Amino acid sequence: MEGRYIVYKTNKVVRRVNFDEILYVESDGRQIKLETECGTLSYYEKISAIAPSFDDSFCRAMSYCYINLSKVRLMSGGIVNFGCGKTLVLGRDSFLRVKREYYNYLRRSIQS
């Protein structure tokens, strides 16, 4: 993931956000919200424009949300817990799908 990034651009700021800084990405109407350990960054973009650049550590949780599996520490009871203490609540079907993807991601990481 090193060297891969998303360009965050607003009227006042242009910033590079590395993939390893991102916990999850979600779409809220016309805005993209990048949730990082330091806070939330919002800007206007379509999630379909940035999703193809994600590597295999990102998992599609819902049509409007992608989770960085490398930042997940625990998944339990419909809640995704990240290493920094932040959480994300998912519906039952989405949680089960992401939990399965997370398990497969961990197995691939061990084998590498």
Describe each model-derived feature in a short phrase.
Residues M1-S112:
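Basic, polyanion-interacting recognition surfaces, primarily
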